[in-house]
């Protein structure tokens, strides 16, 4: 199954600031998202439908729209910072 990957501005801003090796690792993990490795659904009512992908010390927050086969990356950040927002 082929998914379309959409990276929102908030996540893109964080990713472009990463050093090259980390940026490549995070982007590689994002484009492998549909296969799913270290993926968990976020807890809490306000986080319904949001998932997190762990990439080293970084977390990628995303949602999946199976009707349209879209993975939408909504945010990314350091572990401590990202969980304060979600």
Language-model region placement:
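A short, surface-exposed loop/turn module that caps and links secondary-structure elements
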Residues: 29-54
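Enriched for short, Lys/Arg-rich terminal
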Residues: 2-6, 10, 16-17, 21-24, ...
């Amino acid at each position: 199954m082929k998914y379309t990957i959409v990276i929102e501005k908030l996540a893109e801003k964080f990713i472009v600031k990463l050093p090259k090796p980390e940026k490549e690792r995070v982007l590689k993990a994002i484009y492998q998202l549909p296969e799913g490795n270290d993926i968990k659904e976020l807890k809490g009512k306000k986080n319904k439908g949001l998932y997190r992908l762990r990439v080293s010390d970084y977390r990628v927050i995303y949602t999946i729209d199976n009707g349209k086969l879209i993975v939408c990356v909504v945010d990314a950040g350091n572990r401590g910072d990202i969980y304060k927002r979600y």
